[in-house]
UniProtKB/Swiss-Prot annotation:
UniProt keyword annotation of Manganese present: yes
SUPFAM superfamilies: Bacterial photosystem II reaction centre, L and M subunits (SSF81483)
Superkingdom of origin organism: Eukaryota
Species this protein is from: Gnetum parvifolium (Small-leaved jointfir)
Catalysed transformations (reactions): 2 a plastoquinone + 4 hnu + 2 H2O = 2 a plastoquinol + O2
Protein's name according to its UniProt entry: Photosystem II protein D1
Site (Stabilizes free radical intermediate): H190
Cofactor binding remark: The D1/D2 heterodimer binds P680, chlorophylls that are the primary electron donor of PSII, and subsequent electron acceptors. It shares a non-heme iron and each subunit binds pheophytin, quinone, additional chlorophylls, carotenoids and lipids. D1 provides most of the ligands for the Mn4-Ca-O5 cluster of the oxygen-evolving complex (OEC). There is also a Cl(-1) ion associated with D1 and D2, which is required for oxygen evolution. The PSII complex binds additional chlorophylls, carotenoids and specific lipids.
Length: 353
């Protein structure tokens, strides 16, 4: 009898816990994805803050020349970064217990791998949590689908690219200047500006910004008049009021006359689907481009593609970009390589010829 009562009590405790986790009445929805999201994101955030402030220099290139990234080692907010895991570690899973000491783990850039893996798991769970809450509220799943674009981009930069290049040391440093350094090196090694998927991503981001600004300005400008013709339309409203003032018919008419009739939407759902889909699809393509360039399927190469009747090269913008790429590659890992890979791989007989 005692055992039966204990089993019922424990079952009720578990049931209450499940109900609390999945309740949509909580101020912040937790959900089963949140059970994993909360500790992973807290871990990633905590280690990032500590490492950004106090992590010792990291031997990123695996050549016993550590690079300092933390504030206590001479950096500021702009130059500081979490330095990627050493090339000596490569793609090995490198938790603290795999190193002989904490000092060795820090020297080899262990915090970077810890932060990145916990962060990616956390943001993936956040996406799952969005779907879970939508499901419990009877909504459609497109919020999570839209969020999959930045999740895919982060996964491409922090996981797929290092896998393709063979080392976490090729991942993006976690800092402002580190991000720009990663972009410059990526251009030098993969010619990303000439990759069509990157072009689609640029169109998605800048186009999304343009459409967002156009939509916001139209909504705030299309007022349902509550004043007489002799008064300003603004007099009937106050900034930030909750009541809707938007008239989609007026906005449609304005925009149709500004450009042409079929450039505007007269259906609110179609309009907002377009506003969501344009940047999401663009960023999906960018993530796909990063993932293909990770395995060295690079941007278009039009170097020395225009010649005259005598076979002499007529330089184009592509040749200027190629020269800039070589210059950036020379500056990158200057102590690890004598020449850029493009120059080091030239056949000797072609030089002699």
């Amino acid at each position: 009898m005692t055992a039966i009562l204990e089993r019922r009590e424990s079952a009720s405790v578990w049931g209450r816990f499940c109900n609390w986790i999945t309740s949509t009445e909580n101020r912040l929805y937790i959900g089963w994805f949140g059970v994993l999201m909360i500790p992973t994101l807290l871990t990633a955030t905590s280690v990032f803050i500590i490492a950004f402030i106090a992590a010792p220099p990291v031997d990123i290139d695996g050549i016993r020349e550590p690079v300092a990234g933390s504030l206590l080692y001479g950096n500021n907010i702009i130059s500081g970064a979490i330095i990627p895991t050493s090339a000596a570690i490569g793609l090995h899973f490198y938790p603290i217990w795999e190193a002989s000491s904490v000092d060795e783990w820090l020297y080899n850039g262990g915090p970077y791998e810890l932060i990145v893996l916990h962060f990616l798991l956390g943001v993936a769970c956040y996406m799952g949590r969005e779907w879970e809450l939508s499901f419990r509220l009877g909504m459609r799943p497109w919020i999570a689908v839209a969020y999959s674009a930045p999740v895919a981009a982060a996964t491409a930069v922090f996981l797929i690219y290092p896998i393709g290049q063979g080392s976490f040391s090729d991942g993006m440093p976690l800092g402002i200047s580190g991000t720009f350094n990663f972009m410059i090196v990526f251009q030098a090694e993969h010619n990303i500006l000439m990759h069509p998927f990157h072009m689609l991503g640029v169109a998605g981001v800048f186009g999304g910004s343009l459409f967002s600004a156009m939509h916001g300005s139209l909504v705030t400008s299309s007022l349902i008049r509550e004043t007489t013709e002799s008064e300003s339309a603004n007099a009937g409203y106050k900034f930030g009021q909750e009541e809707e003032t938007y008239n989609i018919v007026a906005a449609h008419g304005y925009f149709g006359r500004l450009i042409f009739q079929y450039a505007s939407f007269n259906n609110s759902r179609s309009l907002h689907f377009f506003l969501a889909a344009w940047p999401v699809v663009g960023i999906w393509f960018t993530a796909l481009g990063i993932s293909t360039m990770a395995f060295n399927l690079n941007g278009f190469n039009f170097n020395q593609s225009v010649v005259d009747s005598q076979g002499r090269v007529i330089n184009t913008w592509a040749d200027i970009i190629n020269r800039a790429n070589l210059g950036m590659e020379v500056m990158h890992e200057r102590n690890a390589h004598n020449f850029p890979l493009d120059l080091a791989s030239v056949e000797l007989d072609s030089i002699d010829g």
